[in-house]
Amino acid sequence: MSQASSLRERREAVVREHMESENEHDFDTTLGTFGHPRYEIIPTGDVHDGAEAVMAYFKESRTAFPDQRNELIGMHHADDAVIVEFTLKGTHLGPLRGFEPTGREFSCRMIAVFEFEGEGIVCERVYFDAATILAQLAAGA
């Protein structure tokens, strides 16, 4: 096995651990996959930099969507990143930025770019169509 394929396999294992620990709400494990915790949510412009900010993001998003979960579709590799296609699902059961819970479910296909330095994630940058989620949460409103 070459060094490149070995690094690729280790990075993929880190991303899988990251995503699975998010599903389990084991955010200490999620934070442990980062060399430096940083989330960039492109559609909203939100940047959560550092362990405290990332943990606050987890708390906010899981208060609004306590059953939030991801379902992996595929992974692609670049020299310094793992690009993940997945479906994010959840039920709006708590307040979110001034919006009261609707009780409605959403499902949205997304892309996350996990940037690496060595074997540690230094940024998760997430891309998705916010209108897809909003339309599902507002359906019938």
What are these regions (language model features)?
Residues 1-141:
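C-terminal and inter-domain tail/linker signature
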